[in-house]
């Protein structure tokens, strides 16, 4: 009898991860997919020695994609059970199903015919501005969810939005049926911020050494002032670049002996958006812009070099879906001082005049004063 045989137990959570939630290579590079990939790598690299985790995907292709990502991250694939759908999942042996979105109620139907407390269902918010997301939260009131299910909000502002959606529709139901309704059966709404890995690596190097190496790679003069804009390049779903461009041009004009460079690292959704950005840059003098990415998204290595090469991170976001802002956390992880708009999820990360600066969206044309 082999007494040394390893005994394994399952990680309590079964994770649902279709490729749309983490694949930044074959899908548009946006924050929720970056967060999904970080979550995937984080949870699979921190299993206990005796744990195995169940991951649910929707196709063989997604299994292959997941394995490639995890192998590159150095994850032991023997610790992961890849399941296409629920066919091979024993519902009596799981404690939780976690999805990378807020549509919890569509998963409650699989508890039909079982004890309602057989397992919990959890999810996480990303954008909250779409009609589909608002409807999925509205369904919490009339579907099969219970108080032991939970939606994780990544910021205080995100939690407030979810609570307002629930309260509005709760009052609507009370008015319709002319009765007082209990909230005891609603899922728990909690706040847990997103996290990132140590994405700049090379812990044996100082911040200055990393900056020097990356600037050589990117052909940026070592005495430059490099201001980083990281993330989606979109004037409607992130921020309009005009205030940023004008402010950096004003700083460059004010400090002619300082080589001020805006380093854009991200992706455009289409050629039309790219053309508009390029034309705007040409119209503003003096403005120097180096761009990593574009129609083809910046690679992970390019992002790391951008973070390492920069002096300041700046994000004047003013869109209606900035529930968190993972690029701010990435910048902080790279030891960059942050200047951001006083906006939604950013308020949780950046404490004004403590670990960065927050600027009102009505004063973004004066960003150069904070940079200076």
Question: Which residue ranges define each predicted feature?
Answer:
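Conserved donor-binding/catalytic core segment of Leloir-type glycosyltransferases
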Residues: 221-238, 245, 262-264
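Short hydrophobic beta-strand element within catalytic cores of glycosyltransferases
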Residues: 337-340, 350, 357
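Nucleotide-activated donor-binding/catalytic signature segment of Leloir-type glycosyltransferases, i.e.
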Residues: 71-74, 264-266, 274-308, 312
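Short acidic alpha-helix that forms the nucleotide-activated donor recognition element
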Residues: 91-92, 298-310, 333, 351, ...
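Extended catalytic core of nucleotide-activated donor transferases of GT-like folds
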Residues: 60-144
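Nucleotide-sugar donor-binding and catalytic loop/hinge architecture
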Residues: 183, 205-226, 253-257
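Donor nucleotide-sugar binding/catalytic pocket of nucleotide-sugar-dependent glycosyltransferases
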Residues: 146-213
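Acidic donor-binding loop of glycosyltransferase active sites
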Residues: 305-321, 336
């Amino acid at each position: 009898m082999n007494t040394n045989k390893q005994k394994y137990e399952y990680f309590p959570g079964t994770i649902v991860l279709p490729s749309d939630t983490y694949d930044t290579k074959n899908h548009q590079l946006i924050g929720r997919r970056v967060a999904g990939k970080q979550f995937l790598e984080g949870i699979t690299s921190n299993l206990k020695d005796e744990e195995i985790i169940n991951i649910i995907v929707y196709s063989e292709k997604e299994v292959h994609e997941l394995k490639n990502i995890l192998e590159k991250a150095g994850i032991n694939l023997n610790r992961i059970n890849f399941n296409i759908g629920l066919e091979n999942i024993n519902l009596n042996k799981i404690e939780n199903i976690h999805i990378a979105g807020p549509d919890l109620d569509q998963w409650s139907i699989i508890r039909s015919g079982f004890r309602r407390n057989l397992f919990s269902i959890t999810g996480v918010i990303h954008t909250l501005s779409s009609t589909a997301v608002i409807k999925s939260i509205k369904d919490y009131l009339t579907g099969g969810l219970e108080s032991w299910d939970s939606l994780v909000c990544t910021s205080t502002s995100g939690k407030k939005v979810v609570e307002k959606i629930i309260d509005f529709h709760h009052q609507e139901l009370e008015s319709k049926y002319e009765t007082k309704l209990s909230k005891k059966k609603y899922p728990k709404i909690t706040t847990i911020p997103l996290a990132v890995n140590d994405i700049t690596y090379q812990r044996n190097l100082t911040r200055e050494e990393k900056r020097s190496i990356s600037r050589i790679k990117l052909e940026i003069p070592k005495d430059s002032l490099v201001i980083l804009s990281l993330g989606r390049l979109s004037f409607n779903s992130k921020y309009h670049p005009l205030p940023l461009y004008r402010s950096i041009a004003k700083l460059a004009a004010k400090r002619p002996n300082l080589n001020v460079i805006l380093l854009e690292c991200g992706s455009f959704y289409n050629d039309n958006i790219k053309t508009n950005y390029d034309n705007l840059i040409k119209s503003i003098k003096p403005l120097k812009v180096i761009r990593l990415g574009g129609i083809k998204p910046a690679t992970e290595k390019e992002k790391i070099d951008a973070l390492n090469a920069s002096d300041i991170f700046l994000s004047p976001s003013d869109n209606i879906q900035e529930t968190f802002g993972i690029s701010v956390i990435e910048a902080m992880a790279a030891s960059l001082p942050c200047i951001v708009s006083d906006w939604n999820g950013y308020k949780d990360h950046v404490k004004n005049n403590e670990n960065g600066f927050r600027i009102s969206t009505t004063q973004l044309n004066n960003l150069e004063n904070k940079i200076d």
